[in-house]
A protein has these predicted regions:
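N-terminal beta1-alpha1-beta2 submodule of the flavodoxin-like/Rossmannoid cofactor-binding fold
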Residues: 1-84
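Short, glycine-/small-residue-rich phosphate/pyrophosphate-handling segment
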Residues: 88-134
């Protein structure tokens, strides 16, 4: 069985609720980035051992939370050893705004996965204005 980890930051609890549902659906281990943007050593080890990593962050001002960005920067240690090379990645975000530039956050998550040599998996959904999407 594949080992999946959901790593997320939640500022007000909304992203945590989504992360819990994603983890339940994927039978994944749930790892929360703390309020200072840190993870414990056991959490980093779990990420290294995972077959798939799912990122989660709220979108604030058109990007990921600073705590998630701190985690992303700290992941450079894994980058140097290519610890996440060829892992499968996905991600999610939310914001209080109907638009809120969540797309920019998702591109950032995809870029982070690509920096690590990962394989990004999208939802495969067509734009909602397409007749094929209904």
């Amino acid at each position: 069985m594949s080992k999946v980890v959901v790593v997320y930051h939640s500022g007000y609890g909304h992203t945590q609720r989504v992360a819990q549902q994603v983890a339940e659906g994927a039978a994944a281990q749930l790892i929360a980035i703390d309020a200072e943007g840190n993870l414990g050593e056991a959490d980093w080890a779990a990420l290294a051992e995972a077959d798939a990593i799912i990122f989660g962050t709220p979108t604030y001002m058109g990007g990921a939370s600073w705590q998630f960005k701190k985690f992303a920067d700290a992941s450079s240690k894994a980058w140097f050893t290519r610890a996440w090379q060829d892992k499968v990645f996905g991600g999610f975000t939310n914001s209080a705004s109907p638009v809120g530039d969540k797309g920019a956050t998702m591109i950032g998550l995809q870029t982070l996965a690509s920096q690590h040599g990962g394989i990004w998996v999208s939802l495969g959904q067509l734009p909602s204005n397409s007749k094929a999407a209904t």
